[in-house]
């Protein structure tokens, strides 16, 4: 998302509060993977220390056997060792979360508000609906993670820290997959270099 699109989306989400929109806000403010957001429980959020603990992920597993096609929603461990992490809970997100946490039990899932998690495909479908309503060109849920990473780079976040926040095992993954400099960022880079030599 461009900065303008992200601002429009955040404005829309804040004016249309619901559990699924909360999931989109969490992604934009943390860069969490869709399965991690769906697996997030209230007990994973520490408002006092300002951290979110990521220890689980949710995904749908398709069963391959001779019978009819079937699948099941499973709770699993994160992707890599680096995916087990604590990430910062910024004040803006903490304020949003506090509105939802009042009515929730610690073992309930943040997005569903219940004892069972939200299906990742449900979040993907919801995001597409919001993107359509806002006229956004980006339609892939994972693009929210890319948007977070790009904003961090634009804000001069060092790559090692960003890689740790995203749960990557090495910095090259972050740079190769998630950093998308736009023309304005490229222009600023060249202008800064020119200013340093003249």
Locate each region found by the language model.
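Basic, Lys/Arg- and aromatic-enriched nucleic-acid-binding interface segment
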Residues: 1-34, 38-40, 48, 59, ...
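Conserved tyrosine-mediated DNA breakage-rejoining catalytic core shared by Y-recombinases
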Residues: 3, 39-99
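Hydrophobic (often cysteine-bearing) scaffold residues that line and stabilize catalytic clefts
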Residues: 5, 19-20, 119, 123, ...
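C-terminal catalytic core of tyrosine-transesterase DNA break-rejoin enzymes
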Residues: 25, 29-36, 126-133, 143-169, ...
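Catalytic-site neighborhood detector that most strongly recognizes the C-terminal catalytic loop/helix
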Residues: 58, 94, 166-192
């Amino acid at each position: 998302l461009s900065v303008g699109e992200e601002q429009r989306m955040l404005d829309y989400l804040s004016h249309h509060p619901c559990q699924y929109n909360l999931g989109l806000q969490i992604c934009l403010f943390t860069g969490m993977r869709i399965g991690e957001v769906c697996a997030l429980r209230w007990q994973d959020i520490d408002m006092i220390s300002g951290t979110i603990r990521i220890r689980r992920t949710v995904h749908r597993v398709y069963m391959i056997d001779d019978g009819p096609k079937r699948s099941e929603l499973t709770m699993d461990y994160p992707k890599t060792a680096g995916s087990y992490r604590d990430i910062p809970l910024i004040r803006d997100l903490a304020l949003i979360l506090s509105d939802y946490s009042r009515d929730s039990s610690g073992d309930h899932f943040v997005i569903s508000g219940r004892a069972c998690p939200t299906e990742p495909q449900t979040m993907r479908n919801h995001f597409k609906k919001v993107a359509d309503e806002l006229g956004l060109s980006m339609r892939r849920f994972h693009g929210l993670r890319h948007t977070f990473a790009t904003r961090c780079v634009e804000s001069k976040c060092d790559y090692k820290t960003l890689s740790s926040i995203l749960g990557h095992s090495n910095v090259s993954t972050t740079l190769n997959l998630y950093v998308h400099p736009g023309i304005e960022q490229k222009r600023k880079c060249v202008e800064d270099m020119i200013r340093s030599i003249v």
